[in-house]
Amino acid sequence: MARKRRAARVKDKWTLKKWFTLIAPEYFGMAELGETPADDASKVVGRTVETTLAELTNDYSNQNTYKKLIFKVYRVAGDNAYTKFWRFELTREYLNSLTRRRTSKIEDIVDVTTADGYKLRVKSVVFTVRRCKTSQKRAIRAIMRQIVVEKASSLNFVQFLQECVLGKVPAEIYKNAKKIYPIRRVEIRKIELLAEPAEAETQPAVAEAVA
């Protein structure tokens, strides 16, 4: 009997829950990211959902399947749970596939502020064709940091995120860093949201969808 009553209580908990549709930000076309259950809308706020750029844009070409986007619920209206960008990162498997023996891996981590006041932590990585000298690593790292900081300060949050995710920032780093030493690959491997401007905390950003 005790087992039956316990099973009934578990069943009752699930019957009290409802499903909320997770919605991507406007600059990602307000695409549906999935569903999450809760017995109270307030419990949905703060939850995170992970997807890939391929799933989000329905484009499985290039490296889109290796690019992960994590969104965080900030508002619930009716059955919809609206999310904001929380983190971008490349999968560990993809990064491991880029590592080669007798080559150099150069990384940089820098905190930046976009033109519209978003504070982000950006982690970039460069893979060289062969092992390079310490002085060359230092010069390449300086280029990586300079380009990331300058891009962030001249673009708004959505523009900067788009240029990082779609490869424009890595391409610019590649173009400049190869003058120091032959480069095999450049990636923005991670972007973390540290802080938003005050106005963004109460209303979602409005921008064109990322294509």
Swiss-Prot record:
Keywords, comma-separated and alphabetical: Ribonucleoprotein, Ribosomal protein
GO molecular function, one term: structural constituent of ribosome
Domain of life: Archaea
CC terms in the record's Gene Ontology section: ribonucleoprotein complex; ribosome
UniProt keyword Ribosomal protein, yes or no: yes
PROSITE patterns: RIBOSOMAL_S3AE
Keyword set includes Ribonucleoprotein: yes
Pfam families noted in UniProt: Ribosomal_S3Ae (PF01015)
Gene Ontology BP term (one): translation
NCBIfam families (alphabetical): PRK04057.1
Family recorded in the similarity comment: Belongs to the eukaryotic ribosomal protein eS1 family.
Protein name: Small ribosomal subunit protein eS1
